[in-house]
Amino acid sequence: MSENVPDHQSTNGFSSSDFFVPEEEAGKKVVLSKLVTLMRKLSEQGIDAQNCPPGVRSCLICPKCEVGDSGEKSLTLYIYPDGSSAKWTCRRKCGLKGVLQVDGKLVSKDPIGKVERKITVESIKLEPLCDEIQDFFAARAISGKTLERNRVMQKRIDDEIVIAFTYWQRGELVSCKYRSLTKKFVQERNTRKILYGLDDIEETSEIIIVEGEPDKLAMEEAGFFNCVSVPDGAPETVSSKEIPSESKDTAFKYIWNCNDYLKKASRIVIATDGDGPGQALAEELARRLGKERCWLVKWPKKSEDEHFKDANEVLMSKGPHLLKEAILNAEPYPLKS
């Protein structure tokens, strides 16, 4: 006579739950082993993930940004719960990004190989400037003629109208940077990094580099058309490291992308902001461009204890003649910093 066996039991007398406990424990050990290996591999990439639980997005200090004393945690790290891999990205301009598998294979590290988007005025829905934006620039001593020549436009983002600084290269729109009236910035994603006003320096051997688009426009009001602006602002401090190779110099990719224009210049006047970051930017530019052909602008005094910050501030307060004088009085860049 055959014996009835309960559904929850196997014929050897062990329940299915009992049978699978050792297998589950073994699986946990495998995952733990993978996580330990992954932590070590991440450490080799300069990422300390010891306090980052799997399955949760953790914020860390980016190993590439050099945030100094600010301690900004700009790197987001995600470790997959099964320990198979981890991915990370930095929201600051260094652009560090990567995926690491537990076997140690680095799928990607820097944001290279991205396909550049092709954009047009129509595709990104730019519009002619309204009176409010024109009045904004008029208050900063920037004329409508200068705005028109530089093809400054506007865009509607949600319920807000923002300024659109269009970036052109040989007549082609390659990027666009937006500025709200409350001074918030955003750029079109996955577009080519170039200097603002690039086509204005194609046929000249002497160029001026400023820190922001309004400063480039201000230079034009003072009679200087051979001026470009950096697209990304300034670093907090000068890097203590050697200049990276072209493929790794992501923060200054616009310099490499514009090298065909810049290499023809015999005299480069650096007119960045007079504050700490502005002077750090001046040094980083001079390091890459060659200090022997660079000149540095010192902004005139605003008061006994304070200097003007930038070109647009000089234009607004003192007019085009003093701005022109400041540029003409630029001094040779110190070969030793």
UniProtKB/Swiss-Prot annotation:
Binding of Mg(2+) 1, residues: 211, 273
Necessary cofactors: Mg(2+)
Short name of one Pfam family: Toprim_4
Class of the enzyme per the UniProt entry, highest EC level: transferase
Keyword field contains Nucleotidyltransferase: yes
Cofactor mode of binding and number, as noted: Binds two Mg(2+) per subunit.
The organism's place on the tree of life at top rank: Eukaryota
CDD domains on file: TOPRIM_primases (cd01029)
UniProt keyword terms in alphabetical order: Magnesium, Metal-binding, Nucleotidyltransferase, Transferase
Database matches in Gene3D superfamilies: 3.40.1360.10
Residues holding Mg(2+) 2: 273, 275
Domain Toprim, residue spans: 205-304
GO molecular function: 5'-3' DNA helicase activity; metal ion binding; nucleotidyltransferase activity; single-stranded DNA binding
Family annotation (InterPro entries): TOPRIM_DnaG/twinkle (IPR034154), TOPRIM_dom (IPR006171), Twinkle-like (IPR027032)
Range of residues in the leader sequence: none
Record-given protein name: Primase homolog protein
Organism: Arabidopsis thaliana (Mouse-ear cress)
